[in-house]
Amino acid sequence: MKEIFDRRYPVTSFFLLVTTLVFILMFLTSGFNYTSAATLYKFGAVYPPAIKAMPEQIWRLFSATFVHIGLEHFLVNMLSLYFLGRQMEQIFGSKQFFFIYLLSGMMGNLFVLVFSPNAITAGASTALYGMFASIVVLRYASRNPYLQQLGQSYLSLLVINLVGSILMPGISLAGHVGGAIGGALLAIVFPVRGERKIYRPGQRGIASLAFITLSALLLFIGLF
């Protein structure tokens, strides 16, 4: 437990803890029906018809990142978060990683709202794809050889996983693509440790505006 919730990586530890607690609560309150649509909805999964009917439920765009559909879904995503989250905190810093994770997840869920309007969807994958994409961007922007190599490695993983999202049933391609787009934009917005001048202020401003505009457009389309 001490190794998992490491104080050197407070944000990764926080997200692991919250997601684990949600998963345990789902099982304790619903038993082996914890993957039912009713339970997923109760704990905050994205369900576009509900958000459209009750716009005040846009909080689901954030909460769905902490809800998982089954043990395998939970374990795979938490293992990915455990390893990738630590790298993200080292590269971007804890504060920046906090926002990249949450906002990438939100962007992925906005894509679900628009492009999967009848599906009930949940999982940290939207945020994880954003993390992958944010490191891939550094492949082309950073002068650090380590970050360039890491970005190249994650580019291959990102492509493979996106292809898998297309071929495998029950996978939210919209959420994964949206999360990746969000993460790529946020990698420009938030500075990298030791390379704060990697982008000019104007470039950061354009990326910020693009993220906000895309989010607002998707929300408008999804609600109306």
Predicted features, each with a name:
Residues 1-11, 162-224:
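C-terminal transmembrane module of polytopic alpha-helical membrane proteins
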Residues 4-8, 49-56, 147-150:
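Helix-boundary and loop/linker segments of multi-pass membrane transporters
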Residues 11-122, 169-171:
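N-terminal TM1-TM2 helical hairpin plus the immediately adjacent luminal interfacial "cap"
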Residues 12-17, 98-102, 128, 154-155, ...:
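Hydrophobic alpha-helical transmembrane segments
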Residues 23-30, 112, 116, 138, ...:
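Structural signal for membrane-spanning alpha-helices in multi-pass inner-membrane proteins
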Residues 74-81, 122-134, 172-190:
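Alpha-helical transmembrane segments that form the membrane-embedded catalytic/substrate-binding core
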Residues 88-93, 143-150, 193-202:
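Membrane-interface helix-boundary motifs at transmembrane edges
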Residues 105-106, 131-135, 155-164, 209-214:
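Small-residue-rich segments of transmembrane alpha-helices in multi-pass membrane proteins
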